[in-house]
């Protein structure tokens, strides 16, 4: 059995999957915030309960926001203070007497989608998250490409390309990002960025769901806004695809619930790609809230 943990600032969620990649059981407990020992106990108790329930010693994978393992072997995860700065993988492997694998939550999202029954036909899969921020992951032959610093797939911190500035206007504001750089595409393509673009052009403070509701009602201003956003997304994604050249792009995050993102994006991409490039298949994520647990569990699938 494959045990997948989706760990965040408020909850530890465990999903148990069988060899057919089907969810058999899940359980959630609060994330201890102050005690590392309590954090380890919470994870180990869930594993013990699953082992007893299924009569086996399941493999353990964990998805967690941040950098799963720094150069000194410790976790960096600002949203999980009880475990941040601690050698989480080594400590859990020792206590559970098995190989524990960690990856960041964005890679686990991408891995979950790459192992969808229909999507396994694609060797190179890009997961793109358009949510509070912009991120994602790359999966090749069923395994995440992490890089030495676990920043592969941090698409949101690429800067706006020149053709985007030409499209939006050379006086378009280059916003400072939380990472310290200027002009990161996260500030324009995330859900917050979608709302910021609206306020920038129309001087009205609306949130993304409100703008999308206007779009669905046929509001001309909202439709012009969505056209502009999709053009900007196509420019930025075209630049990424020139490097990655994936077979499939799976879009998750809050904006993935807006059908225009997946239905209208592919037609805009060719003019931003090399003439010989083929537009990848573009799909909305299929596994929702279970994606983090699925992806973490599937860190062991290609053994």
Curated annotation (Swiss-Prot):
Disulfide bonds: none annotated. Pfam families: ROK (PF00480). ATP binds at residues 4-11, 133-140. Keywords: ATP-binding, Carbohydrate metabolism, Kinase, Metal-binding, Nucleotide-binding, Transferase, Zinc. It catalyses: N-acetyl-D-glucosamine + ATP = N-acetyl-D-glucosamine 6-phosphate + ADP + H(+). GO terms for biological process: N-acetylglucosamine metabolic process; peptidoglycan turnover. The keyword Secreted does not apply. Its EC number is 2.7.1.59. Pathway: Cell wall biogenesis; peptidoglycan recycling. InterPro entries: ATPase_NBD, N-acetyl-D-glucosamine_kinase, ROK, ROK_cs. Zn(2+) binds at residues 157, 177, 179, 184. It is an enzyme of class 2 (transferase). One of its GO terms (molecular function) is zinc ion binding. HAMAP family: GlcNAc_kinase. Belongs to the ROK (NagC/XylR) family. NagK subfamily. PANTHER family: N-ACETYL-D-GLUCOSAMINE KINASE, ROK (REPRESSOR, ORF, KINASE) FAMILY. Catalyzes the phosphorylation of N-acetyl-D-glucosamine (GlcNAc) derived from cell-wall degradation, yielding GlcNAc-6-P. This is N-acetyl-D-glucosamine kinase. It comes from Shigella sonnei (strain Ss046).
């Amino acid at each position: 059995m494959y045990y997948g943990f989706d760990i965040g600032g408020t909850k530890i969620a465990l999903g148990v999957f069988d060899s057919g990649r089907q969810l058999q059981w899940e359980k959630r407990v609060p994330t201890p915030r102050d005690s590392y020992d309590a954090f380890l106990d919470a994870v180990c108790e869930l594993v013990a309960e699953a082992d007893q329930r299924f009569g086996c010693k399941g493999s353990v994978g964990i998805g967690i926001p941040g950098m799963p393992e720094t150069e000194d072997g410790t976790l960096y995860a600002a949203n999980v203070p009880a475990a941040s700065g601690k050698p989480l993988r080594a400590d859990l492997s020792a206590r559970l007497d098995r190989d524990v694998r960690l990856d960041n939550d964005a890679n686990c999202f991408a891995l979950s989608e790459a192992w969808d029954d229909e999507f396994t036909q694609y060797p190179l899969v890009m997961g793109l998250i358009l949510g509070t921020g912009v991120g994602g992951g790359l999966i090749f032959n069923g395994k995440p490409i992490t890089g030495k610093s676990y920043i592969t797939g941090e698409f949101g911190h690429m800067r706006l390309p020149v053709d985007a500035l030409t499209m939006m206007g050379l006086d378009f504001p280059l916003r400072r990002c939380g990472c310290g750089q200027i002009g990161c595409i996260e500030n324009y393509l995330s859900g917050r960025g979608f709302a910021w673009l609206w306020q920038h052009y129309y001087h009205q403070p609306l949130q993304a769901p409100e703008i999308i509701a206007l779009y669905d009602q046929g509001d001309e201003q909202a439709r012009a806004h969505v056209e502009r956003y999709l053009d900007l997304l196509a420019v930025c994604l075209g630049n990424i695809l020139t490097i990655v050249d994936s077979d499939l792009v799976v879009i998750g995050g809050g904006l993935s619930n807006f059908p225009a993102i997946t239905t209208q994006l592919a037609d805009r991409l060719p003019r931003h790609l090399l003439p010989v490039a083929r537009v990848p298949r573009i799909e909305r994520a299929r596994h929702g809230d279970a994606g983090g647990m699925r992806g973490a569990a599937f860190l062991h699938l290609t053994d």
